[in-house]
Amino acid sequence: NVASALLEQVKYGDQSRYLRKLSLSQIKKLKGKDMLAIYDKVRSVQCDLHYCGTLPVEKVIGTIRQHLPLERTTVASNSPYYRELKQYDRPTVFFIDMPDMAQSIVYGYVKGDPVDDKASRHASQLFSVYFGGDMSSLMFQEIREFRSFAYRTSGRYQLPNHAHKGTAGSFTAMLSTQSDKTLDALGVLDSLIREMPLKPERMEAVK
């Protein structure tokens, strides 16, 4: 949707998945031979194969070899792919003005510091659940349940895959609310971020 496309642009710039995928007009111009060439190129990239079933291993291997030329998978895979996060040196607000809409979808994004250790990874997971991960989180309870300032809330600190140690994570928060409640909801979110209340009983549940 529009809000998701804007968030991708803010976080990743030209690396936004909405900018990198082919447009409908470009797809219509593709020829059959172009698609086959792309498929052949994809088959040369190294991959992991998973099978769940009752067939003997030898039969599974034989079936795979019939359809995938494993001896030609010589191109190293860069999966999971890492996209560099954008850094902003001052608070910046991006708008998409849609006058006929009665609802606001607001995202907040902050690029974090590089993290390598396991303790920080576990801490980020705990924080995400505690702060905005589900219906018992701070965001949901304080913004939606107690004050009815939003329809939906979420807030998570996301770290890159283990394969990309030393790269930055990011904090992303989201509010979906009525236009006339937007500033009120943002005010509560700001207070939760700046002075996050500690609720010991909730921490035990998160663990």
Per-segment meaning from a language model:
Residues N1-N78, R152-K207:
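Charge-rich, well-structured scaffold segments of protease-associated domains
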Residues A76-E142, M174:
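His/Glu-based metal-binding/catalytic segments typifying zinc-dependent metallopeptidases
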Residues F131-M135, M139, R144-R152, S191-E201:
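Hydrophobic alpha-helix feature that most strongly marks membrane-spanning transmembrane helices
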Residues N1-L6, E84-Q103, R144-S154, K199-K207:
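Short acidic/His-enriched helical or mixed secondary-structure segments at domain edges of catalytic enzymes
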